[in-house]
Amino acid sequence: MNRFFIELYLDEDVDVLVADLLRARGFVATTTRDAGKLQASDAEQMACAVGRQETLLTHNRADFEALARTYLATGQSHHGIIIATRHPPHEIVRRLLLILNQVTADEMQDQLRYI
């Protein structure tokens, strides 16, 4: 596949400022509003991220851990899930950059990471 840079899809519960800060640093960051998916279910958000080949960023640990298990159990692939604890947007971006600057999109495939 050879995808180098991780592109992110931000779940509805992630502050849109995170996307703005990432874009200012040259990263691709799609919000649920950008994708026209406001108020979509978690499964729909995940399917959208998969379709866009983007890693999903969320604060919703329980539901997205369950979705990751479902994808694994059913042999479905995804482009990664990053679960962030709630912090100010600048802190979330600081933590994200540790992954974005060290992990390729291919390495993120089917991974579940926590920041």
Write out the residue ranges for each language-model feature.
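Short catalytic-loop micro-motif centered on adjacent basic/acidic residues
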Residues: 31, 56, 83
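Conserved BB-loop
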Residues: 28-40
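Acidic, metal-binding active-site segment of PIN/NYN-like and related structure-specific nucleases
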Residues: 42, 48-67
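Acidic, PIN/NYN-like endoribonuclease modules and their adjacent C-terminal/linker elements
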Residues: 1-12, 16-19, 23-24, 37, ...
